[in-house]
Every structure is written in structure tokens, then in C-alpha cells.
Amino acid sequence: MNRILSLFDCPLKDVKRFLPIISRQGFNTVQVSPLQKCKTDSKDSWYLLYQPLGFEIGNRIGTKEELYDLCLEAKKYGINVVVDAVINHVANKSEKEFLEPHPDTDEELLSNKDCFKEKKQITNWDDRNQVINYCLGLPGLNPNNPIVQKKIIDMLNEYVDLGVNGFRFDAAKSIALPEEGCNFFPNVTYSLNRWLPIIYGEVLFADNELIEKYARYMRVLTNSDARDRNSIIKFVENKDSFLSKDLGYTKQWPKSRITRDYMILAAHYPNTLYYARNYTHDWYEWQSEFVKEANLKLVKK
């Protein structure tokens, strides 16, 4: 059973400070924001954390040393540390040239055109061909390219060596599966230096068949349902539903509704994620007795 707390945009040194409370609240996993070097370390735009220049570790969220210290301390509390890994795309050049890689992007990637997907934007999310072969508003990486795979595997193993217990694969739905001609997920997940207790990929608005295919390689973070509830991680709210201008459908929901719905999820699903609402007074709701009670109750069969 996994009770995951997403402390989005929270510095690692603060996550470390919160570990006693996280443990007391019944969370056994904490998810931290992407740590890859991004095109700017500005705190004004949260989405810039999802515009990495490559796979070098260290940004305003924290350093390698701070991550190592966090993992070491979390182990004392029996808490897994999960890092959000941006593996589908890199930073863009500008808002106008949004499918062009930023000039400071990893040089080896820039010098190999085959490292990138075709410069076409997804316009129909119901078209699987577009979802896996086009871009989602940023320069998409070619998951079948051996250079791309090696760089991602090297980064993930560097995280593993620092003590990380798992990963969230951002935009996993846009990375093709073996039956679609792509060996990315088996290659990457089977190349880690050690077994990890929790790896999950973001696959939103998906049918049961697609979820089951991704679940062969990892758990699936989703707002959809599945026949095998142990294969998925459910949430009421995430960063996109709260912060995004286009997808922010939970922004107007009161914290009482979020907590109520989370309690219902936790009663029926073995794996759940609670998003701490950053930049607001509601951020502290994850510390409420209601959330604690939901996490510590047994899941109904």
C-alpha cells in the first residue's frame, strides 16, 4: 500500500524538515519536484521545472547533496523518496518557437536530430498516433533513440545511487509501448542499478486496456479506473488540475471537498496520492486529522 504526499515546488531542505509530520500523517512516500537543470530557476513560473535542458541533476529545488541527505533521513522514518523525472521532452527556445529546443539544451541531443520527435503539435488526444509521435507543446524526445535512452538511464541510476526509492515518469502516456514499436520502458526499467519499491508513470484519461499495457512496467498514476486497482495510483487533485490555466478544474474546489474525496479514494484504493496545494493557505491541509485518518484506515475489499 502506498500513501504518497506530493510536495510540489517544495525545496528539499524543507521536505527533510517535514519528515516527522509526513510520517505521523500516515504517508509512506513523498514525491518531490523535478530536479533536472532547467532553462531558468525563476520561482515565478512553476511549469519551468518541466522544461529541463537535459538530465543534469540540480536546480532551485535542491542539489545532489541535499537529495542524498533527504533520502538518508527519510530512511529513518520508513519513508520512500520519489523524484519526478521529466523524460519526454526538453525546454523550448521561446513561446513562439515552442517546438524548437532551447539553445542551452544538452549539446549531444542538439547535435543529433534523431534524438527528437517530429515537430508537430498534438491536436487530438484521442488519436494514439499523435499522442506518441507528436509533441505536447515542447520539443519531444525520441524515446527509441539510444542516446536519449542512455542519458535517461544514467540520470535515473545517479538518483538511485543518491538513495532515491522510486520515480514518477512525467507524461508517460506520450511514450510509446513495445507493441507500438518502442522499447523504451522495458529498456529503462530493467537497467536500474537496483530494485525500486515504487515507480509510476503519468497516464491520464486512459481506458483500462491502455492502463494494463503500461502496468507491465510500472504502476500507473491516473484519474481513470482499472480492473486491477493495485496497478494504479489514484488522486483527487494534482499540480495541473490546480495550477494549470487550461486544465485547472479543481482550482475552485474548497479544501473540504478535496479532503472528503481523498478519504473516499483512500478507503477503496491501495495506492493514492495527495497533492499539497502550494502557494496557498490550503497547503497545510495535508497535515489535518482527516487526511491522517484516511491514510491509516484499512482499504475496503
Model region roles, listed by residue range:
Residues 1-83, 88-92, 98, 127-143, ...:
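N-terminal structural segment of carbohydrate-active enzymes
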Residues 3, 17-23, 34-36, 41-50, ...:
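Active-site-proximal helices and loops of the catalytic beta/alpha 8
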Residues 59, 63, 144-148, 177, ...:
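Residue-level preference for long, well-ordered alpha-helices that form the structural scaffold
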Residues 91-150, 229-236, 243, 263, ...:
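Glycan-binding loop/region signatures in secreted carbohydrate-active enzymes
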